[in-house]
């Protein structure tokens, strides 16, 4: 069997993207890094986004950290998801930065969250810390769009959280708010502050926040598609 090669330009169709992702299934991160001419770090402490970057190289992703989807021409977002030996997610999934000001007139339909989750290529990766990073295997990809029920669930969470932001209750939002979608601090250090609306409508400084999918959402999604018991 010939070895796969990284795509040198963005995929032109979903079929091409999925076929390339399927070729990576079963390879270890160390093998894929070596084939792409990259060095595998010992761990992810200093290179938290390394797995995502590696898979972006292999799949010809175009967006980098821009607000558009990773595969902008296809409208597809790439999400790697660390899983345990039973295929269950080990952590929440970052979606996008939560806007804390300038939210008048924003609706679920026009929101950044919905834009990012409209079409997602999920790639499970072994994530248990007992497995050295280079030995962790890439799993089977899943090309997904939210069904009506999932869209409604996410919409309700988004509306509840955005109402709290707009009404100046940002400091009262905890990770427990939202059934499937949560907001929590995004900054790596506590000095990186951003503007938000306070309880009396005044401008305050607070930690940047991000939207994350909770594990119960991604766990059900993976179980349904991969028939995990």
UniProtKB/Swiss-Prot annotation:
Cellular compartments per GO CC: cytoplasm
Subcellular localization, as worded in the UniProt entry: Cytoplasm
InterPro entries recorded: DNA_mismatch_repair_MutH, DNA_rep_MutH/RE_typeII_Sau3AI, DNA_rep_MutH/T2_RE_sf, Restrct_endonuc-II-like
Keywords: Cytoplasm, DNA damage, DNA repair, Endonuclease, Hydrolase, Nuclease
Gene Ontology process terms (BP): DNA modification; mismatch repair
Tagged with keyword Membrane: no
One Pfam family linked to the record: MutH
Top-level taxon of the source organism: Bacteria
Molecular function in Gene Ontology: DNA binding; endonuclease activity
Disulfide bonds: none
Protein role: Sequence-specific endonuclease that cleaves unmethylated GATC sequences. It is involved in DNA mismatch repair.
Protein family (similarity comment): Belongs to the MutH family.
Protein name as it appears in the record: DNA mismatch repair protein MutH
Organism: Escherichia coli O127:H6 (strain E2348/69 / EPEC)
Lineage, opening ranks: Bacteria, Pseudomonadati, Pseudomonadota, Gammaproteobacteria, Enterobacterales
């Amino acid at each position: 069997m010939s070895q796969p090669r990284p795509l040198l330009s963005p995929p032109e169709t979903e079929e091409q993207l999925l076929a390339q992702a399927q070729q990576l299934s079963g390879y270890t991160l160390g093998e894929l890094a070596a084939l792409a001419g990259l060095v595998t770090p010992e761990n992810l402490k200093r290179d938290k986004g390394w797995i995502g970057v590696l898979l972006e190289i292999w799949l010809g992703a175009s967006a980098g950290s821009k607000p558009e989807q990773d595969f902008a021409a296809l409208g597809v977002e790439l999400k790697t998801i660390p899983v345990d030996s039973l295929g269950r997610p080990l952590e929440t999934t970052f979606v996008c930065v939560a806007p804390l000001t300038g939210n008048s007139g924003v609706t679920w339909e026009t929101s950044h969250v919905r834009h990012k989750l409209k079409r997602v290529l999920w790639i499970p990766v072994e994530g248990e810390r007992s497995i050295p990073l280079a030995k962790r295997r890439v799993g089977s990809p899943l090309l997904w769009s939210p069904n009506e029920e999932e869209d409604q669930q996410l919409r309700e969470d988004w509306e509840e959280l955005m109402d709290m932001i707009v009404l100046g209750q940002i400091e009262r939002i905890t990770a427990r708010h939202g059934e499937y979608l949560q907001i929590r601090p995004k900054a790596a250090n506590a000095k990186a502050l951003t503007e938000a609306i306070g309880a009396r409508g005044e401008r305050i400084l607070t930690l940047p926040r991000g939207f994350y999918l909770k594990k119960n959402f991604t766990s059900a999604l993976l179980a349904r598609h991969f028939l995990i018991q």
